[in-house]
C-alpha cells in the first residue's frame, strides 16, 4: 500500500504527509480491540453516550 502524499507541497518545504503521522491509514489495518478507557474516549462513540 503506497503512502499517499499531499499534492499541495511547496518546493523547499518538507513534504507533508497527506494524513499526518498516526491518522489511521497505516494504523487502521491492524484493528486491535479497544480497552475500556479507549472506548470511553472514542470519538465515534461519543454521540452514543
Swiss-Prot record:
It is found in: Spore core. This is Small, acid-soluble spore protein O. One of its GO terms (biological process) is asexual sporulation. Residues 1-49 are annotated as: Disordered. Belongs to the SspO family. InterPro entries: SASP_SspO (IPR012613). GO terms for cellular component: endospore-forming forespore. Induction: Expressed only in the forespore compartment of sporulating cells. It holds the Pfam family SspO. It comes from Anoxybacillus flavithermus (strain DSM 21510 / WK1). Keywords: Sporulation.
Amino acid at each position: 500500500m503506497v503512502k499517499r502524499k499531499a499534492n499541495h507541497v511547496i518546493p523547499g518545504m518538507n513534504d507533508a504527509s497527506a494524513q499526518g503521522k498516526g491518522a489511521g491509514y497505516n494504523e487502521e489495518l491492524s484493528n486491535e480491540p479497544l480497552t475500556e478507557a479507549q472506548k470511553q474516549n472514542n470519538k465515534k462513540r461519543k454521540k452514543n453516550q
